[in-house]
Amino acid sequence: MWVEIFQDNIERQQEFGINTQTFYLYPMNVVIRKAVKDDCAEMMGLIRELADYEKASEEVTVDFDHFVESGFGKDAVWWALVAEVDGKVEGLALYYIRYSTWKGQTLYLEDLVVNPVFRGKGIGARMMDALIAVAKERKCNRINWQVLDWNQPAIHFYEKYNVYRDEGWINFHLEIV
């Protein structure tokens, strides 16, 4: 009965143009915070889950110790925000700073992933808003990221932020072995 009342409420709110993205189906204690070293195992779980979704499981080859050292060692090269739901890491936004000779400092979002159980409940939006705050704090002029062209849910999510597509660019990478 609670779910039916909730759904009826959502439909009525949508009729009046009220943003329902931040309403939750059940009470949750969600905290968006900077990642700490102890989060790395759960973060790697989310990264593997994302790779599975993107049909690229075999591409996750990073050694766990290297991953931890790269984020929390003396010369850290990445940082992350996590979404903690009732004390468990259920979302991740991993980023690093890069430099554009045309634009200056840019925050590059490597991965934004929320456990599928919690998608559509406003957690991704809260993480994106927190990431925008980090970019402003670090004096970055923009945030860049990539999305697979078939990942329509992600594209739809990002388009809510009035984003620009970098049409005409081809991505390259070179394996160093």
Region annotations inferred by a language model:
Residues 31-43:
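A short beta-loop-alpha structural element at the N-terminal edge
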Residues 44-70:
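Conserved GNAT-fold acetyl-CoA-binding loop/helix
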Residues 70-82:
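A short helix-loop-beta-strand connector motif used in the catalytic cores of GNAT acetyltransferases and
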Residues 82, 88-96:
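Conserved beta-strand in the GNAT
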Residues 112-119:
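A short, internal acetyl-CoA/4′-phosphopantetheine-binding micro-motif in the GNAT/acyltransferase core
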Residues 120-133, 160:
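Conserved acetyl-CoA-binding loop-helix of GNAT-fold acetyltransferases
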Residues 125, 137, 149-168, 174:
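Conserved active-site alpha-helix within GNAT-family acetyltransferase domains
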Residues 136-146:
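Conserved GNAT acetyl-CoA-binding A-motif
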